[in-house]
Amino acid sequence: MSRGAGALQRRTTTYLISLTLVKLESVPPPPPSPSAAAAGAAGARGSETGDPGSPRGAEEPGKKRHERLFHRQDALWISTSSAGTGGAEPPALSPAPASPARPVSPAPGRRLSLWAVPPGPPLSGGLSPDPKPGGAPTSSRRPLLSSPSWGGPEPEGRAGGGIPGSSSPHPGTGSRRLKVAPPPPAPKPCKTVTTSGAKAGGGKGAGSRLSWPESEGKPRVKGSKSSAGTGASVSAAATAAAAGGGGSTASTSGGVGAGAGARGKLSPRKGKSKTLDNSDLHPGPPAGSPPPLTLPPTPSPATAVTAASAQPPGPAPPITLEPPAPGLKRGREGGRASTRDRKMLKFISGIFTKSTGGPPGSGPLPGPPSLSSGSGSRELLGAELRASPKAVINSQEWTLSRSIPELRLGVLGDARSGKSSLIHRFLTGSYQVLEKTESEQYKKEMLVDGQTHLVLIREEAGAPDAKFSGWADAVIFVFSLEDENSFQAVSRLHGQLSSLRGEGRGGLALALVGTQDRISASSPRVVGDARARALCADMKRCSYYETCATYGLNVDRVFQEVAQKVVTLRKQQQLLAACKSLPSSPSHSAASTPVAGQASNGGHTSDYSSSLPSSPNVGHRELRAEAAAVAGLSTPGSLHRAAKRRTSLFANRRGSDSEKRSLDSRGETTGSGRAIPIKQSFLLKRSGNSLNKEWKKKYVTLSSNGFLLYHPSINDYIHSTHGKEMDLLRTTVKVPGKRPPRAISAFGPSASINGLVKDMSTVQMGEGLEATTPMPSPSPSPSSLQPPPDQTSKHLLKPDRNLARALSTDCTPSGDLSPLSREPPPSPMVKKQRRKKLTTPSKTEGSAGQAEAKRKMWKLKSFGSLRNIYKAEENFEFLIVSSTGQTWHFEAASFEERDAWVQAIESQILASLQCCESSKVKLRTDSQSEAVAIQAIRNAKGNSICVDCGAPNPTWASLNLGALICIECSGIHRNLGTHLSRVRSLDLDDWPRELTLVLTAIGNDTANRVWESDTRGRAKPSRDSSREERESWIRAKYEQLLFLAPLSTSEEPLGRQLWAAVQAQDVATVLLLLAHARHGPLDTSVEDPQLRSPLHLAAELAHVVITQLLLWYGADVAARDAQGRTALFYARQAGSQLCADILLQHGCPGEGGSAATTPSAATTPSITATPSPRRRSSAASVGRADAPVALV
């Protein structure tokens, strides 16, 4: 590197020091070879000789100095930082005469690079600064000192520049030399195991390289980029210090054992330094600095080139230690080094201390810092996290926009739980085994539900406090699977958090994480999966995970799912808050309410407003004034005019949920003739199902009674003309590109009771047809005053209930109900052709460009600029989808307005569902009798426990097995299929009388005597058994029939035995024979003169339970006797309405049918008959036609 003259400059370079512990073995020193001596002489730096009287020194003064330099560099090649002048001369090396022994005391402002004090017995060498040559050193301490050098030859003309006879590079200053006498023979060397250490970061430029001050913060860990020279020198230093000057060197870093010849080949590169103080780049210290300290080298058998082979007898040339620049370090008086130097001396001495022969109190060799705990390791962890681009710790510079929401995650666990490793793996993607003893905070950007969130993670070192419990949105409890104490600590921490937060405050997402990081052969797993899941169940709303930060197992999943739970809980809280804040509509007097009947175009209109006091007349001037001022009002006034047409998008039907809602649930809007609007504004609208795809501007109003209305203009809304409405009870709202919230209602309306209008354009297309089918439709406005219908209306509105159900799905093209349109529903082929027509290009699609232009023009008027028109990603649409699949598209002017509309509609949908009474609850006229029936089922013999696992209080039932099961076994029974087990809930489903009779007649005791007669020594699962054990038992019991009771020894066919059992009304025997009949077809031919089947006989006996069992197990419901009569004839002849209803529900033809019915049609049961009006389809749901077994 060029060392030309230049201004005073300082270069600060951060170096990484690689510390390596090497294995030392005692070997005899090799004899110095001429080639080694020559190589060492070629690589040394030239300088003035310290012994001019010596012949060898006079001839080759540089070679002696080079050899000595190599000897000292093998000991240590580290120096502190210093500033120098570019044109300063290099230090001169001269022999240092002996001086009386006295301690070395650095001058003020001087840093002494004393790195280590070798352990072992006192050495005879000493340090003695003596300006006079000839003194003999007597001190017993020998520090490791070196002069920075490249090891190459010195350019000519650079020697000198100092005081004659001195090695100081500073002119005009005195010289102090430190000389080291040869030490006594080293003690017996010990053998140590070679171990690579960790890296440590150096301090900043002007500070000491030996340590860092407390005010400089934690060190930053960077990549390992140790150069060959530095690594070799440090390894050599380690070798020399550990050996104490004796023994040979065996370094794993390389570069030292090569000898002086290898060093001679090294050449300095531009801008690269091999010393910590850049002294090789800036050799000259500033003027006025103290003289350097010099000391003679000590011969060691570990060096490749010894002084004995290169020098004649005489005083050895000393090695000069350059003092640092003044003012860079505060000095210490009284012979003490600086605090940081002493700390680093202690640190390096502890590393290089031998296990034997060391001073008392020296501990064993420390392991790698990454596997130990301590403040240094914690600082390394913090530095690594700060250096990572994925994590930001306590950073005030890395911020996001205020519009980005924050998710606050707290992490709790004890010191051995592995929570720090979990967080570290999530933030940086790397593994760190250390645990923090202090609370820390982290930040990371995360994508949840397609939206960016800033996740704030707080790692709590101790127990949570009140501030933490109020701050966190979610808490992750972490424990180690191999540590019982950490598992117990989680339970204790959860109790403390619950007491601080209280039961009243909800919305806290919890997660329990078991870490597998420390599990090994020596520390096995002690916390089982069952215990962990039991604790998770006790925490409520908690999810359990097992992670491994070493390999990253489930680490990202934990934080992602916890963040998802927080977002979901927030949405639910916002929805509930919006529902609670719904305004209550005031009650108005009905005296001024004009109730108007509606009709389609050309239909009959009945106006009953004349029977009530009419509203006051409004003049044209007042009308114009009101119309002009309505734009500034939040709710435009309602003008009470004559009856105006407002088409309902849903066909009004008798018995629908919308008509069953009470007046108070509709908003109690009986005074003004119009419901109170909750939200209203202009929106763009287009229908999703009509042919017209153009966007149209509509004035949309959301009413408090659960209806959404839209009109072409605000004037039409004021006059209640040309408007359409939709009942939000049967709809849902969606936003394109967003995942809908997981809001599940307790009960919802049926999807088969709604008829919808396509669009206004479709209504206009069907006007001619509507004119020929007049039908009055009730007013959409709720009122207690219903208009009395005329005779025609009475005739049309009082059809048979079954006929009304059959006609409920048939609509005219406009969507209105018509009693004359009885066309059957379209076949799949017709639907396919209809879809094909819709997918073909039409003329209306050609006008898409014109519609887009209109929409952009409206945006231009709304925004007032062209800024957002050509941005394709700006889409402010939301969709309203009905239960039948019809879609309405609306578009707002901004994201805020769209979100406000969506939130208001969702709140109104939820309010409508909560206020609507279910039809199932309405039809329960005798709930007390049903409760008595369910209690009778529970009182049956053996029904107090589960039939399969013995769990108490089962709440589910298997109908065709006649047994009660628990909720865990019910899921397995559902997987078996309805041909094996028909599952129904005791609490959630209806229980008609025929099903109640089956459950009370059989019971768990009878069922187990049939299906579980001989277990063959197999253990029955208990209530604590796993799902796999339960499933294996249930399938063996009901699917494979392994435990089925054997038949009697009678040789009669099964058909005759079944006939006899039915005739004897033996339910248990019938159930057993039906179970055995599953192995093959059942021969039901008996010697009956009337050719009756067991089903005929059961119907004749009016036995409901046997009739139901025969039908469930595949009896031929259409079988006829010799006179062509079905079982329905015998049931009615016996007067059993329950048996008749069961047969009708399973598709039994009437008793007057022809006997020539085809067997194929007869053997396929289908639900085609209309049940009696007094009974709903109770068993039709369990008597499905997809049962694959036809046994009878």
Curated annotation (Swiss-Prot):
Residue numbers binding GTP: 413-420, 457-461, 515-518
Region listing for Interaction with EPB41L1, in residue ranges:
1-23
| Composition bias, Pro residues | 92-106, 283-300, 312-326, 775-790
Q: Which GO terms describe its molecular function?
A: ATP binding; GTP binding; GTPase activator activity; GTPase activity; phosphatidylinositol 3-kinase activator activity; phosphatidylinositol 3-kinase regulator activity; protein kinase activator activity; protein kinase binding
Recorded hits in SMART domains, A to Z, give: ArfGap, PH, RAB, RAS
Region Interaction with PLCG1: start-end pairs:
267-390
State which tissues express it. Isoform 1 is brain-specific. Isoform 2 is ubiquitously expressed, with highest levels in brain and heart.
Residue span(s) of domain Arf-GAP: 931-1051
Q: Name one Pfam family in it.
A: Ras
Residue ranges, annotated region (Interactions with HOMER1 and NF2): 180-225
Residue ranges of every copy of the GLD domain listed in the record:
402-578
**Which residue windows does the record flag with biased composition (Basic and acidic residues)?**
47-62, 330-344, 654-667
Q: Which domain of life is it from?
A: Eukaryota
The ranges of the ANK repeats are: 1090-1119, 1123-1152
Q: Which GO terms describe its biological process?
A: actin cytoskeleton organization; endosomal transport; negative regulation of neuron apoptotic process; negative regulation of protein catabolic process; positive regulation of protein kinase activity; protein transport
State what changing residue 947 to M does: In a sarcoma cell line
Q: Where is the composition biased (Low complexity)?
A: 35-44, 79-91, 107-117, 124-153, 165-175, 189-198, 224-242, 301-311, 582-596, 606-615, 1154-1172
Activity regulation information from UniProt? GAP activity is stimulated by phosphatidylinositol 4,5-bisphosphate (PIP2) and, to a lesser extent, by phosphatidylinositol 3,4,5-trisphosphate (PIP3). Phosphatidic acid potentiates PIP2 stimulation.
Q: Provide the domain comment.
A: G domain binds GTP and has GTPase activity.
Query: How would you summarize the oligomeric state and partners of this protein?
Result: Isoform 1 interacts with EPB41L1, PLCG1, NF2, HOMER1 and HOMER2. Isoform 2 interacts with activated AKT1 in the presence of guanine nucleotides, and with the AP-1 complex.
List the protein's name: Arf-GAP with GTPase, ANK repeat and PH domain-containing protein 2
The species is Homo sapiens
Q: Which gene encodes it?
A: AGAP2
